[in-house]
Amino acid sequence: SPNIVLILSDDQAWTDYGFMGHEDIETPNLDRLASRSRVFRRGYVASPLCRPSLASMVTGLFPFDHGVTGNDVDGRNNREKLDIPVQEQFHQHPSFIKDLVKNGYLAHQSGKWWEGSHFDGGFTHGMKLNGRHGSGESLSIGRKGIESIKSFVDLSLNDEKPFFIWYAPFLPHTPYNPPERLLEKYRKPG
């Protein structure tokens, strides 16, 4: 079984990569990975919002079928409490992640994940236990390193099991705080 790494960037156009033909943006590591991977060049979203789109990708259902139709539930207070029935309904649906695990994969969640704990989502390992977009370590993935992913890959190799990695860094979402070396590279004179 092949290992699978799903990379989901936040608020980034499909054209913003070297391997997709951007003339200015350089993405050498992603270009190298793309050259030996399957790249989906014609992807479409089920919703213009993050959360329902991710839920549709996981379940294969439209938002009105899986019940996640917005990023936030209505209500000024107690949003987390009001969101519990939405998450419970979501977890009743099929999921490609649960299918991978049933077929012997180890599955790791890192970065953005809206639907409760990674265990609820069918992942065997993960970073996020709660929160709207993730919290702490989950949102710092990519900005501060990928140690949890490296450890997970080592574990999978030691266990001789195929792996699935959900790598959904909050990048390039705000705050825009690139390393100075990259900022200088793209800064225009004057």
Model-derived regions: residue spans:
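Formylglycine-dependent sulfatase
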Residues: 1-190
